[in-house]
Amino acid sequence: MTVTALGLPTVARSTGDGSAGASPAPADGPLVDTYGRAATDLRVSLTDRCNLRCTYCMPAEGLNWLPGDALLSPTELARLLRIAVARLGITSVRFTGGEPLVVRHLEEVVAAAAALEPRPEITLTTNGLGLARRAEGLKKAGLNRINVSLDSVDAAHFARITRRDRLPDVLAGLAAAKAAGLEPVKVNAVLDPVSGLDDAVELLRYCLQHGYQLRIIEQMPLDASHSWQRDNVIDADRILQTLQQHFELTPDSRPRGSAPAELWQVAEGPTHAAGTVGVIASVSHAFCSACDRTRLTADGQIRSCLFSREETDLRHLLRGGADDAEIEAAWRAAMWSKPAGHGINDPDFVQPVRPMSAIGG
């Protein structure tokens, strides 16, 4: 079995006068690009700071963090969320980092999103440190569900990958999220080239035993050191081949839609319950044609793609007195020029300057 490639958009970009490529972005309606894709999923990075130092993300000494006055205030962020939902048709908001749990006003931000009309689905991606004591409060604030990044349930492997000996804290956070009703609890894993395939098997077994849904993600070129190499990526086909040696997998029959993960049903076994596992083949089997995301960084920049090399500055507009219509127009223009695909496999691909920790997952 192999994953299915969704490929690049089939809606051609025109280039002549009066064409889609030459015309301005629509002034209303869905938040579309020139390839016909509509963005309904907003990814919001709340901070570039993180309390782990994962080897594929940032160096051991950390990075130069954004200064406090560069970050959007809760009031500024609430305004952009309102514009996104009320004027641009956003139906889902995911808060990310860096690590969003280091943000003290996280519950306030979640509550502001939950108060919007129409109310969007509100989700969070976190490394799980501190989640055990905040899961209940986040649920009360309006959080619907959660994704926890966890690359290994082997303590030594976890410490090597994250440069922190904190696996018990993450596992406690997962349990607290489930107890708080932030379900389905999903686990996001990026496989380490050294131990990743073994880790994938044990992760899936652990998730099935505890009622979590595992998503395994191909490592992407978003590390701060720009040392990513395609040859080191454990691709989706190898992941599936390995899992099939230990579990009985069948393709999930539900339409995939714009979801990045291709799902597989896992049959019950002697050591685990039945469940699902997803594989996100970001590199080897692009799904850019179905992308429905728009991204807002912690310092107020709009990115149309994880791998964009251009950004649109909404913070400047916010602080310069722009009205909602002007901000909406800038956001629409940013998304209108979204590229056809991420370009990772192009010979002239250039990694974005911002690392993943400063963009948000």
Curated annotation (Swiss-Prot):
Please report the stretch or stretches of sequence annotated as the Radical SAM core domain.
34-252
InterPro entries attached to this UniProt entry: Aldolase_TIM (IPR013785), Elp3/MiaA/NifB-like_rSAM (IPR006638), MoaA (IPR013483), MoaA_NifB_PqqE_Fe-S-bd_CS (IPR000385), MoaA_twitch (IPR010505), MoCo_biosynth_MoaA/MoaC (IPR050105), rSAM (IPR007197)
Q: Where are the transmembrane segments?
A: none
Q: Which cofactor does it need?
A: [4Fe-4S] cluster
The residues that the entry says bind GTP are: 43, 94, 125, 186, 293-295
Catalytic reaction list? GTP + AH2 + S-adenosyl-L-methionine = (8S)-3',8-cyclo-7,8-dihydroguanosine 5'-triphosphate + 5'-deoxyadenosine + L-methionine + A + H(+)
The EC code for this enzyme is 4.1.99.22
Q: In which pathway does it act?
A: Cofactor biosynthesis; molybdopterin biosynthesis
**GO BP annotation list:** Mo-molybdopterin cofactor biosynthetic process
UniProt keywords (A-Z) are: 4Fe-4S, GTP-binding, Iron, Iron-sulfur, Lyase, Metal-binding, Molybdenum cofactor biosynthesis, Nucleotide-binding, S-adenosyl-L-methionine
- Gene3D superfamilies membership: Aldolase class I
The residues listed in the UniProt record as binding S-adenosyl-L-methionine, with positions renumbered to this chain, are: 56, 98, 149, 220
Q: Binding residues for [4Fe-4S] cluster 2, per the UniProt record?
A: 288, 291, 305
Low complexity biased stretches: 16-30
Co-factor: note: Binds 2 [4Fe-4S] clusters. Binds 1 [4Fe-4S] cluster coordinated with 3 cysteines and an exchangeable S-adenosyl-L-methionine and 1 [4Fe-4S] cluster coordinated with 3 cysteines and the GTP-derived substrate.
Residues bound to [4Fe-4S] cluster 1 are 50, 54, 57
Q: Which family does it belong to?
A: Belongs to the radical SAM superfamily. MoaA family.
Q: Quaternary arrangement and interactors, per the entry?
A: Monomer and homodimer.
Q: Under what name is this protein listed?
A: GTP 3',8-cyclase
